[in-house]
């Protein structure tokens, strides 16, 4: 498989940017034996105020990528080790700068191999797969939203109450340098197909509906990942949501 990638970001209505994202591509000529990683994409949405959130997301991306590249073993083993390194990076920063205590970040990291991919995520940053006209979220949502939706399904809350609940966007798990409460680590290789589009995003993307995200991908995917990423960010801006959060997208297109 051939992979093309683009990263785009918008600060939104915030006075600072707390998102971070990075990609790493394997050097040309990397042997195909075993389970070689061709592309690694990671996105982090920081929290903890102007300085803390930005520091946290940068540390998470940097620590995750460095450990994954260095680590040996299966993709699953490497992703787990990289997540632990990212979590350790937060702990180390807080140890030497106690004023940063309370900072943290979401994380979604995806390793792309020759014909499949693997991921790990913590928090609420979504990972989408667009394939043949349909889009699905692949990773778990570690915010309170799924909990509230279960309460709606059981009749204990109305949909309106769930939508208005102030806890809706609270995180049940995040990379904060302590034990991780919830981790979504893909259990088996996820087969890739030519013309797949994979999107990692921070939760600012939720200012537009999933059906709109899918429509944009369908309209722009043949123009490449940069055009698709630009269109997604433009749609978020055009939504003009009050107090718009930072939005970052990493768009990966898969070719034969």
Model-identified regions with their sequence ranges:
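PP2C/PPM-type serine/threonine phosphatase catalytic domain
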Residues: 1-256
